[in-house]
C-alpha cells in the first residue's frame, strides 16, 4: 500500500504551521514533519485589533509550495484555526472591511444587551454555547451598529478557516465544528438560528448551510499543475485536538492546552439543562455527530504575555525556577475578563493580587507560579463541575496540545484534580486535522480507529496525583466563590 501524504495548515493566535503527515496504512505508521512555521499577531488598523490575513495567506501558500518543491505528491490539504472570527466578501469574492480579532473591544456591553432583549436562557436553549463577549453573535451586532455601510457591500461571511479554503479553491464552505463556536447555530437543527441572526442584523443570506467534517471543498492547483483536494476538516482547532485525544473510554476527560485551555468530555447528546447554563458550559460541535461538552479557560495566554513582557526566552529555565517556589502564595481568577487583553499582563496580575489582599508577585518566576497554581486550581474546579453535570466521575484527564509539554503544570493539574493525567500528543490539532483527511481518503473508518493510530504513534506521559503536595492540600481551601465565569 502506498504512503499517503497529507498537509495540515494549523493556525493559532500566535503562530501558524504547515505540517506534512506521512501515513503507511499497513503498519499504521504516522509521522509528522514541520515544513513551514510563521508568526501570527494582531495589528492595529483604523483603531481595531485585526488579523493580517494577507500575510497569513502568503505564508500558507509558501508552506504548500515548499512541500511541492520537495517532489512530494500531496494527497489532500486541511486547514484548522481558532474560532468565532470571520471575513466578509462581496459578490465578486473580494474582501469587505477588516478581519477584526475577537480580542478587539468593539463588543463591549453587547452580551448584556442580547440577554436583556432575547433572554439568557433562550439564547442558551437555542445555541447551547457558552456566553463569551467575543462570540460571533456579538461581533456581527457590533459590525452592524458600528460599520453599517459594510452590510450592503457584503454578500458572504466566512469563518477564518473557511476563508483560507476559499482562497485556495474559490469555493465557499461553512464547516460545522467552527460554525458552532459563533453562538449562531441552532443546537437542534445544526443550521443557522434565524432568531439569533436576526438580532445581529446580519443577513441570513451571508451564510450557507454548515457542513460536517469530511467533505472536499475544492482543489488547490499546485505550481506543478496537480489538483490537490482541500478537505473540510474539523476546522476549529479544538475540535481537531479532541479528535486526536487518545481517550481511554467514555469516562476520560480532555484538556486542550494552549493559548486557551479547553476542558471537557465527549457526548452523543448536548447538555443544555439549567445546571449547564449556570456553569456556563458550552456544547460545541465535533466529528461524527459528537458534542464537545466543555468549558473555556483563559489558559496559557497569560503566560505568553508575561514571557513577552519580561523578555523571557528560556521557558524551561523559567519553569525550573518556578518549581522551586512555594505553591499557592499568589492566586488569581484566570477567567476574569480583566485578563483578556490588558495593556500589561504582568501589571494586571499584580493588581489582581493586590486587590485580593494577597502578596504581589514581582519576579518572572513568581508571576509564572501565580499563573500555574491558579490554572491548576481552576482546572480542578471545572473538572468537578463537569463530573457533577454528567453524574459520574472521570477516570483520567488527557492533556493535549502545546501546553502538555509543561511538566510542572501537568503535575500541578494531577495533584489539584486528584486524577491521573496523561499528557500528549503535543501536535493534537495538527493530528486531528490529518485524521479527518485520512478518513476522507478512506484510509481510516472513524475517529475511534484514528485514536488507535494516535496511541500507537504518539509519545504519552503519565502523571500520578500526589495527595500530599502543597496544591493538593490547598484545594480543600479553594473557594469557588473566589472565581467568576469567564466573561459571563
Swiss-Prot record:
Its EC number is 2.7.1.5. Keywords: ATP-binding, Disulfide bond, Kinase, Nucleotide-binding, Rhamnose metabolism, Transferase. The keyword Kinase applies. Its cofactor is Mg(2+). ATP binds at residues 13-17, 259, 304, 402. It is an enzyme of class 2 (transferase). The keyword Nucleotide-binding applies. GO terms for molecular function: ATP binding; glycerol kinase activity; rhamnulokinase activity. Pathway: Carbohydrate degradation; L-rhamnose degradation; glycerone phosphate from L-rhamnose: step 2/3. Substrate binds at residues 83, 236-238, 296. Belongs to the rhamnulokinase family. This is Rhamnulokinase. It comes from Klebsiella pneumoniae subsp. pneumoniae (strain ATCC 700721 / MGH 78578).
